[in-house]
């Protein structure tokens, strides 16, 4: 199992009815772990409610749930984690002279133990973990706003396998 697959299982997986279930709105991630579920067909499920999106799902009773201390391929794990839980965008703010500028920003969301594990393996300085209140409760984030750090992180994460749609969008910012 690659680090990339471990990240997908860690973030998109859950135990349900005695089986480990992986679901995601992007079929790419279900396809990326499908070889770990050799006898399980995967399927598309319809979501309930007008604001929800349909999602892809695969499940099996014969899969081991990954733990953070079992990760050996940290580059792959971080790539999967940031693809699933990260946002790369342009941040509008004023510089010292008062002009509005747009700077590249990478925000990575998650729970404290996983965020710390990922942040410890990224080529960037230590950041203060921020609390982010959402409609689902509380989550945490690290925000990288230095263009040099963001570029170094994206360069470090670059590799395969990866979700090409996300990387095309990210490359449009670089």
State where each predicted segment sits.
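Internal intein/HINT superfamily modules and their associated LAGLIDADG
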Residues: 1-174
